[in-house]
Amino acid sequence: MSNKITEAFAKGKAFIPFITCGDPSLEITEQLVYAMEEAGADLIELGIPFSDPTAEGPVIQEANVRALSGGVTTDKVFDMVAKIRQKTAIPMVFMTYANVVFSYGTEHFIKKAAEVGMDGLILPDVPFEEKEEFDTVCKQYGLDLISLIAPTSHERITQIAKEANGFVYCVSSLGVTGTRTQITTDIGGMVKFVKAAKDIPCAVGFGISTPEQAKKMAAQSDGAIVGSAIVKLCAAHGENCVPYVKEYVKSMKDAVREA
């Protein structure tokens, strides 16, 4: 288990922003990482663009399209991370799809991710039953394969939690990523089941966009994950998005702190 991921949750409730690498450009992505860290982010999720991101709603899908048409490749993302690692040690995890890893070569991808300084990997389209081939290689190279747990049966939550590493990504609602007006899932109940099975941090994502929602979710867990709302700011402001994202992340981290 990556100690850096554990540390991200050791300072109180964590705020975890997500951005798509290369939207609007890899140079801006790099600047966003530094700005979000300054604004109080505890761990950063970096999305490696993929042509068919099944777990994503329209906002992140469009960001993937923009990044890919801008020429972003997995290798360019690795180079960017290596550059970021010269300036900051903030915990970072990749979020991408099995196909991105397969087409690069599973071991090659995971080894390279570890070499450039990533701490973990989230593969939303890989079900629990199929994670073994990735998990084994991740363990070999010291990368945490982060498990997602959606609203499901107590038994399944327990089964997934027992084998989880790093932190557990609790999915607040079934369906794709995006902003929701209301989150009705019993997050507190889900977190209790996870903690009963394993002593591991739980962060909640999918559908959080306002400070109020972030505070409410963090109150029932160890942190809040926000993607679409940040990606929307990148889409709206393009090359000038950094100060807007920084201000937003600060407001979200402040809310999470109060939880």
How would you label these PLM feature ranges?
Residues E37, I48, Q61-L123, V256:
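Active-site beta->alpha loop and helix N-cap motifs at the rims of alpha/beta catalytic domains
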Residues V77, K192-I200, S209-K215, A219-A259:
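Alpha/beta catalytic cores of nucleotide-metabolism and tRNA/nucleoside-modifying enzymes
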